[in-house]
Amino acid sequence: LWLRPWPSMRHLITVKGKELITTSECGGPGCIVLIPHLGNWEVMSLYLASEYNLVALYKPIRFSRLDDFVKSGRQKAGARLVPVSGRGVTEILRAVRSGGVTAILPDQVPANESSGLNVPFFGIKCATATLPFKLREKSAAKVILGVALRTQNGFNLIFRDLDTIMSNGPEEALSGINRAIEESIIGNEAQYLWEYKRLKCRPAGEIDHYG
C-alpha cells in the first residue's frame, strides 16, 4: 500500500457520498472525517489527502527507520502530518477552520480520562474520545464518517453525514458516533480490527473484558 505510487492505485477505488465533504479555499469551515478501525483506514487517508488539503495527527514510532517508512507512506498522497500534542490539535483546528480537512480515528482509546467520556459501544460502556466533538464545537466544521471497505476488486469508500448527531451535547454526540460505527460494522464484521482493545478503558468497577 505505502510502496505503490498513489496514481497506480486510484482505479481500485469507488466512492459513495463524496458530495458530503465540503471544503472552502476561500476560508470558512472545512470537514472532520471520522475513520474507524474498519476495512482499510490507511486507504481512506490516502484518498482524502489526494483530493483535499488534509492535516492529520501522527504519533512518531520509536524506531527511526520504521518511522520514516510509515511517515513517508502516509504523506505520499499529500497529507500534512502534525504531532499528537496540544500544538498538533491547534494545527488541525486551524486547518478545518480555514476550509481544510482532518481525519480522526474515533474509536481510538483516549490517552487519559479527561479526554474521553464513557458511552456505549455495542452495549458496553467504554472511553470514547471527545476530540471530534470539541473540534466541531470550536470550528463549526462538518462531521463525516468515512469507511474504506475491502472488495474483491479493491476498496469501496463510503461517507456518511454525522452533522445532526454532532449538534447534540457531548455524551449524545459520542453515543451517536459509536452507533454509526456499529451500523458500519454490521454486515462487515470480518473487516473490523477486533484485536484493538477498544474496551480496555472502562468505568471504575466494570468488567475487564481483557483480564
Language model region names:
Residues 1-32, 67-71, 76-79:
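Membrane-anchoring hydrophobic helices of lipid-metabolizing enzymes
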Residues 22-27, 50-51, 87-211:
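Non-catalytic C-terminal accessory region of glycerolipid acyltransferases
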Residues 55-91, 95, 113-116:
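Short, conserved active-site entrance elements at the starts or edges of catalytic domains
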Residues 32-36, 55-61, 129, 146:
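Short beta-strand->loop
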Residues 11-15, 38, 63, 82-86, ...:
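A conditional alpha-helix N-cap/helix-loop micro-motif detector
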